[in-house]
Regions:
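Transmembrane helical elements of multi-pass membrane transporters/channels
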Residues: 10-29, 133, 144, 167, ...
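N-terminal transmembrane alpha-helices
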Residues: 3-31, 35-36, 49-64, 68, ...
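Helix-terminus/linker motif at the lipid-water interface of multi-pass membrane proteins
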Residues: 24-42, 111-121, 177-184, 239, ...
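Membrane-helix boundary and inter-helical linker elements of multi-pass secondary transporters
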Residues: 34, 71-74, 153, 182, ...
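Transmembrane alpha-helix boundary and packing residues in multipass membrane permease domains
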Residues: 15, 19, 27-31, 48, ...
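Short alpha-helical transmembrane segments in multi-pass integral membrane proteins
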Residues: 1-15, 69-137, 181-236, 292-356, ...
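Short runs within selected transmembrane alpha-helices of multi-pass transporters and secretion channels
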Residues: 62, 133-152, 160-171, 189-205, ...
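Small-residue-rich hydrophobic transmembrane alpha-helices
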Residues: 41-101, 141-160, 264-329, 362-374, ...
């Protein structure tokens, strides 16, 4: 096994576990509030979706810090390392009040927006109650993302994973107490989430303080605006790419709705099942970005080799996942609670989605090389074009049912994937050292 593959596996494994833990938090809350009725489940479900979208905002700070810190670490540039850490925290301080305070103030119209017109008054009230705690608590999630970004930039992906598992363990322990025993309902679910993440954040800050080299200037010093601007310039394309892809997934629901109600339900259930696979692609992408940035900082031009290993790793995972979905589709959708026409449609979707998964895996893996090289902006354009094309093709092919939608997804992903592969082959071998 080559050096690059070993390093990618070592970095990606913990990142994958961390991403799975993030999804598990919403599942834990849903399981406990399910005993309170459908309105409570709807409130927690839509609030979790909102949180996922908001997470894309703070990726500007977390991802930007990771890449700049990894590059500076590779170059042995202590001042650039300090600047990356400062820039990440400055962005957190700027963005968090806008989201937390603004979200709390606008929780009522936000609840109405995400639940849609004609929503049940009970569900609206419960969603507002959940947002009243969860949106101010987003400050904790944002801070945890920055802590994780710093640790990953230092080459440590295991500690963020452990912190996520700690938070989930606390949520699992607190949910039955707060939701049921103390009769706090959805407020209890929101409170347990904030408390669990807060404890994990405090532990992360303590560990981070020990990991950062001793010396002045890590969290204070001159040039704060320049530091923040550098992190934002690096992280913004990654954040935009995430948000565009999330928006495209949501928009595709409207196209699927033209096919039928069972197909919409099947698409929603199958998409959740696909998260297990797609999160592994994003884990490889993060690992590739960290490794690439570190190599560039060290003056080693090996982006082509790293990209090839990332393609092999992510593509291999996609092939295995596609084969598993093809064989186990009925059991997967059944295990997620689907039955009848929904189960049939969900199984068909999972059996047709394999080519899309493989192309997506390759595109996401190559994205890590561009992120680590500071050229992620090109990915934003490719992703945006791909999402627009996906919607147009899905609309045109919706007459063929879910197989037509899967074909549209594959075709729309093939074009940006081919463009990314061509750009990867033509990467300038000259190494740009961080200034």
């Amino acid at each position: 096994m080559g050096e690059h593959r070993r390093r990618l596996l070592a970095l990606a494994g913990p990142v994958y576990a961390e991403l799975l833990a993030g999804v598990a938090a919403g599942i834990i809350n849903t399981v406990w509030v399910a005993r309170l009725g459908g309105d409570a489940v709807a409130a927690v479900a839509v609030a979790t979706n909102v949180e996922n979208v908001l997470l894309g905002v703070v990726l500007v700070a977390g991802s930007g810090t990771t890449v700049l810190l990894a590059r500076a670490r590779g170059a042995g540039d202590a001042e650039a390392m300090r600047g990356a850490v400062r820039g990440g925290w400055v962005l957190w301080a700027l963005v968090t009040p806008l989201v937390a305070i603004g979200g709390y103030a606008g929780r009522a119209p936000l609840a109405a927006l995400v639940l849609g017109g004609g929503a049940d008054p009970g569900a609206l009230a419960l969603t507002r109650a959940y947002f009243a705690l969860a949106l101010p608590g987003i400050a904790v999630l944002f801070a945890s993302n920055v802590v994780g970004g710093v640790l990953k930039g230092l080459g440590d992906t295991r500690t963020p994973m452990r912190l996520s598992l700690l938070a989930n363990g606390l949520i699992l322990a607190l949910d039955p107490l707060l939701v049921l025993a103390l009769h706090l309902g959805v407020r209890g679910a929101a409170l347990s989430t904030v408390l669990g993440r807060s404890v994990a954040l405090l532990c992360g800050l303590v560990l981070l303080r020990r990991r950062l080299p001793r010396g002045k200037g890590w969290l204070a010093g001159g040039g704060l605006v320049a530091d923040a601007r550098g992190v934002a310039a690096t992280g913004l394309p990654m954040s935009a790419d995430f948000v565009i892809r999330m928006a495209g997934t949501l928009a595709l629901v409207g196209v699927v709705a033209r096919i039928g109600v069972a197909e919409v339900a099947a698409y929603g259930i199958a998409t959740k099942a696909l998260y297990v696979a797609t999160m592994s692609f994003y884990a490889v992408r993060q690992a590739t970005a960290i490794h690439t940035a570190h190599l560039i900082g060290a003056g080693r031009e090996e982006r082509a080799a790293v990209g090839r290993e990332a393609l092999r790793l992510s593509g291999g995972i996609a092939v295995l996942a596609s084969a598993f979905l093809l064989a186990a589709g009925p059991w997967i959708v059944g295990g997620l609670g689907a039955g009848g026409a929904v189960a049939v449609a969900g199984t068909l979707y999972l059996r047709c989605v394999g080519p899309y998964l493989l192309l997506l895996a390759c595109y996401i893996a190559l994205g890590g090389v561009f992120e680590g090289s500071g050229r992620a902006a090109v990915l934003v354009r490719l992703t945006a074009y791909g999402q627009v094309l996906q919607l147009a093709l899905a609309y045109a092919l919706s007459g063929y049912g879910l197989p037509g939608v899967c074909l549209a997804m594959a075709l729309a992903t093939a074009l940006p994937c081919a463009a990314a592969a061509r750009l990867h082959r033509g990467l300038d071998p000259a190494v740009t050292r961080p200034s």
